[in-house]
Amino acid sequence: MVTATHPHSLGRLSRMRHLARQYAALTKPRVTQLAVFCAIIGMFLATPGMVPWPVLIGGAAGIWLLAGAAFAINCLVEQKIDALMRRTAWRPSATGEITTRQTLVFSAILGGAGMWLLHVYANDLTMWLTFATFLGYAVVYTILLKPATPQNIVIGGLSGAMPPALGWAAVAGEVPAEAWFLVLIIFTWTPPHFWALALYRRADYAKSGLPMLPVTHGERYTLLHILLYTLIMIAATLLPFVYGMSGYIYLAAALALGAGFLAYAWKLYRNYSDELAQRTFRFSILYLSLLFAALLVDHYFKFVPQV
């Protein structure tokens, strides 16, 4: 016997799915995925064996939820700015589809659940470090730095660079020098990554009133700083090998990927175009993903010739 689904039920289900997608959009899923990926790599690098499943799943979920909570607050604070920019005008906080109160409640639920998961399945160090990262992004970067200085992405970049240290702490209960090397890599990667985006979206940022480097200092100044920070980033990526935490598999990957990033930065500096800046931005995401994947492969298949 076949029963028909009532059209009102279908409409209600469709609205619920749409609302779920809108709430998910507040968490900036693509950015969150990259952050959690780096945190998971940090977990595996913290131990010579397998990460315990409860820590892996519970810890990653907790970091994911707190990251999503921070991004939701970011969307809330910048809702008027987002409404002015073509890149972000579709966000539910900017359109008003999700209200201020709903966003605050949503962020509080995500943050509370994330803290609980980290307390239960990881440890209190990870819980408080992740909460500090939440405050660093949602308050220090979003509210204080971003509207105040063109160096916002440099000064405030630490919060976005923390995921590997959070993952490491979840497994080891400490944050040693090796974990801070990973943080430094992301910290130095962030300016050239973000400034490439800001260059080809500079009209949007000029309209928003945010003091982004291409708007306040111009194209050539920004291109020079992308090139300089790329060189600093490449130097930072060599630290895991120099310190002995990685072997030649990682070194080869770091040098090859660094050469690719430097080539993009140099081409941008010599012959800028919005299309090339967009390609550089996209490559920077691939770069970080492959670099951390190489760290993981090297960790389990380290090749260091015996002297």
Swiss-Prot record:
Broad class of where this protein is predominantly found: membrane
Keywords noted in UniProt: Cell inner membrane, Cell membrane, Heme biosynthesis, Membrane, Transferase, Transmembrane, Transmembrane helix
CDD domains membership: PT_UbiA_Cox10
EC number: 2.5.1.141
Membrane-spanning intervals of the chain: 31-51, 53-73, 103-123, 125-145, 153-173, 179-199, 223-243, 246-266, 285-305
Pfam families found in the cross-reference section: UbiA
Membrane topology: Multi-pass membrane protein
Protein location: Cell inner membrane
UniProt record, GO biological process: heme O biosynthetic process
Catalytic activity of the protein: heme b + (2E,6E)-farnesyl diphosphate + H2O = Fe(II)-heme o + diphosphate
Family the UniProt entry places it in: Belongs to the UbiA prenyltransferase family. Protoheme IX farnesyltransferase subfamily.
The protein's role, per its UniProt record: Converts heme B (protoheme IX) to heme O by substitution of the vinyl group on carbon 2 of heme B porphyrin ring with a hydroxyethyl farnesyl side group.
Remaining remarks: Carbon 2 of the heme B porphyrin ring is defined according to the Fischer nomenclature.
Annotated protein name in UniProt: Protoheme IX farnesyltransferase
Gene: ctaB
